[in-house]
Amino acid sequence: VYLLILVVLAIPLGNYIGKVMNGERVFLSKILVPCESFIYKVLHVDKNEDMGWKKYSFSIIAFSLISLVILFFIHLCQGFLPLNPENIKGTSLDLAFNNAISFVTNTNWQAYSGESSLSYFTQMIGLTVQNFVSPAVGMCVLFALIRGFFRVNAKGIGNFWTDITRSILYVLMPLSVVLSLVLVSQGVVQN
């Protein structure tokens, strides 16, 4: 049944993602365009800027390094951060670095017991955020590569900040809502 659902949804979902990443209107545009515009305004992003491969690559690396540093320090400082009713101390330097690298690169390798080693804050703000932004970065890389092949004579391969915003807002968040409703309807544990 699972494979059948994947096969049936592959083409419509692929078409939807293609339209989103090309900036075309989709059924969620009416709701999400104001959110998207607000994000661009707050971050001072020119959504129409077409980045060359060097600027696009630099944006990916800068974004990933900033994510890495933030997640690393969340792990180290979790003993002082909120949402830590068990008073779990910060992780060791090597474990914090390993976890940060792992989640930023979307490998999500866990060398610890999450329930007893990480606070709620670290899990929610650190890891869950990375569970959205690291696949979004992967989607950005994929679409930049595709554009690079198809835009032979163009100077740019898209805008990283636009791509990551759209991949999170239009693809990953809606998919997570739909799939979480499916899981809730099946009685999956909420805690």
Which role does the model predict for each range below?
Residues V1-N98, L142-F143, F150-G158, T162-N191:
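N-terminal alpha-helical transmembrane segments of multi-pass membrane transport
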Residues I5, E115-R147:
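Pore domain of cation channels
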Residues P12, A100, V104-A111, N131, ...:
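Functionally constrained cores in energy, signaling, and assembly domains
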Residues P82-L127, V189-N191:
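P-loop potassium selectivity filter motif centered on the GYG triad
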